[in-house]
A protein has these predicted regions:
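Broad, structure-driven detector of short, well-ordered beta-strand segments within folded domains
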Residues: 96-100, 149-154, 222-241, 323-330, ...
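Bacterial N-terminal signal peptides that target proteins for export
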Residues: 1-8
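Bacterial N-terminal signal peptides
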Residues: 8-16
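A short, solvent-exposed beta-edge/loop patch
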Residues: 144-176, 384-421, 427, 461-479
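Long, C-terminal catalytic modules of enzymes
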Residues: 411-502
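Short Gly/Thr-rich strand-loop-strand
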Residues: 116-155, 187, 198-199, 349-402, ...
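Structural boundary/hinge residues at secondary-structure and domain interfaces
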Residues: 20-146, 183-229, 233-235, 241-337, ...
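Helix N-cap motif at beta-to-alpha junctions
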Residues: 115-121, 162-166, 346-350, 410-412
Length: 502
């Protein structure tokens, strides 16, 4: 058991200490894959400060190996591998690919594939560890790891995962290596392999055909679109001072391409004027879309989503009055109430009228101006009175003014201009922009206590802000920016935790 635990530890160490520069082994991913993860182990370990001559992780692992009481031959071999991971036999200087394929409900197929550095080195390592027995079949070596799992390898590649019959799997792997039944050459897969982040994840619609309710999912899409013809790629990168996650939609048919192109045209650039009443000190959101095109998209989905005529008519009434712009701010907690303001560009007061018609009891509404109202959101109760009378203590605002239908839980903040102008350069050219400023953690910490306060303080110390927005083409981007601009998030968090533990 000690040797088995050590083997797992060693393999994790190898992944962390390895590099990744070439594009080998990707032909072993099956063509019916639903999900593929590609790992650039070297970049991940280097950017998290886990490798190098002064690597604390490497020193720690070597210390653990020496303390395990292993035979000298095994101990020396493992120490050599920690210095040079290729001596394990597995070439972790190339990408690793993890995948899920097949019928995920009845007969799922999972595996990890990659490239070999030396078949003999891997065999020597397995024999030295004395955990599994190496066997041969058709010129390929294998170890049965469990009743239905095996490690299969030759001088060029390796596979680890679910195996029903070793000989059948060997034949299948040889075919994939030759290009038959491989995902290699797939447009989306090749695009993923060209990404530069530390890790990528690919979702393939073609694989989704094998999951339950796939036909129902296609039926809920606009006419002419099929679930099998879409793919998406998520690319995760680490840079000094930030982590970046980019999600890209990859059309796999002309119909999907036309749909995406049309959808992108519905996005318009956020107007600087939308930021006038919004502060960047908390959570802020901006949107600018073409309302006519947006309504057309909803109309195309009405039947699939069973939107009845009455509801569709109400949606049309709202969107016909909508000019496409919206701005939202959450600035914290004030008097135990969330401080939220929303401004929606509308052509006239009709949208307000529609809201008032459906709001219910308006007895406590106070009209404070033309199309401007206040209504209570919190009360003090007189529990000694006969009818438990109540007195409003907090008011929200709702109305139409300056070409906008607005709502705010803080009546004092409506149409007030922040002390500092919003950093408009951050939103230039974007149609959707969401920003979370870590200053909000300071605000929340003032209202918190105990462990909650400690958490908010820690988050405020580490993070500067996070933002999400539509990027180039059919992409969405999320950036997490740290206070320390020299360290990436993994390094910064690791240093913070170490300081806390010390």
């Amino acid at each position: 058991m000690k040797r088995l635990s050590f083997l797992v530890t060693m393999l994790v160490a190898l992944m962390l200490l390895a590099s990744c520069s070439k594009q080998q082994g990707q032909q072993l991913v099956p063509e019916d894959a639903l999900f593929v993860m590609r790992i650039d182990a070297k970049q991940a370990s280097e950017k998290s400060g886990l490798t190098g001559d002064k690597s604390e992780l490497s020193k720690w692992l070597k210390k653990q190996v020496k303390a395990m009481g292993l035979d000298k031959e095994v101990r020396d071999k493992v120490l050599d591998i920690l210095d040079d991971p290729t001596k394990s036999g597995i070439d972790l200087t190339e990408p690793l690919y993890l995948y899920a394929a097949g019928d995920l409900e009845r007969d799922p197929d999972f595996g990890i594939v990659g490239t070999m550095a030396s078949k003999s080195n891997l065999i020597d390592l397995i024999k030295a560890l004395d955990v599994f027995e190496v066997e041969e079949s058709n010129g390929v070596s294998y170890c049965e790891l469990d009743r239905d799992a095996a490690l299969i390898f030759n001088g060029d590649w390796f596979f680890g995962g679910k195996v029903d019959d070793v000989d059948d799997m060997i034949a299948t792997l040889k075919e994939r290596a030759g290009g038959k039944g491989s995902l290699d050459g797939n447009k989306a897969f090749d695009k993923m392999c060209d990404k530069k982040g530390v890790m990528q994840v690919l979702f393939l619609g073609e694989g989704l055909e094998n999951i339950p309710n796939a036909s129902e999912m296609t039926a809920m899409m606009p006419d002419g679109l099929d679930i099998k013809d879409f793919a998406s790629i998520v690319d995760f990168g680490l840079n000094p001072g930030e982590a970046v996650l980019e999600a890209e939609f990859v059309p796999m048919s002309q119909e999907w391409q036309k749909y995406v192109d049309k959808s992108l045209k519905a996005m318009k650039s956020i107007d600087d004027a939308q930021t006038k009443y919004i502060s960047d000190k908390g959570l802020s959101l901006f949107l600018n879309i073409d309302p006519k095109m947006f309504l057309e998209q909803i109309s195309n989905l009405a039947e699939a989503y069973e939107i009845d005529d009455e509801s569709m008519e109400m949606i049309e009434d709202v969107l016909e009055n909508f000019d496409g712009t919206a701005s939202l701010e959450f600035s914290g907690i004030k008097d135990n109430q969330p401080s939220v303001s929303l401004y929606v560009g509308t052509k006239n007061e009709d949208a307000l009228g529609l809201l008032l018609q459906n709001i219910g009891d308006m007895d406590e509404f106070q009209e404070v101006g033309d199309n401007q109202y206040l209504f209570p959101t919190d009360y003090d109760y007189d529990w000694e009175s006969e009818d438990f009378s109540r007195t409003p203590t907090a008011w929200a605002a709702l109305g139409f003014k300056n070409g906008m239908t607005y709502f705010s839980t803080d009546k004092e903040s409506v149409f007030s201009t922040p002390r500092e102008k919003y950093p408009v350069k951050e939103i230039k050219g974007k149609g959707l922009y969401l920003r979370f400023n870590a200053d909000l953690f300071d605000t929340l910490a003032k209202e918190a206590s105990g462990s909650d306060k400690q958490l908010f303080d820690a988050l405020s110390d580490l993070f500067d802000y996070a933002e999400c927005y539509n990027g180039e083409g059919a992409t969405g981007v999320m950036r997490i920016v740290m206070k320390d601009k020299k360290k990436n998030p993994v390094e910064a968090i690791a240093d913070y935790v170490k300081k806390f533990l010390d």
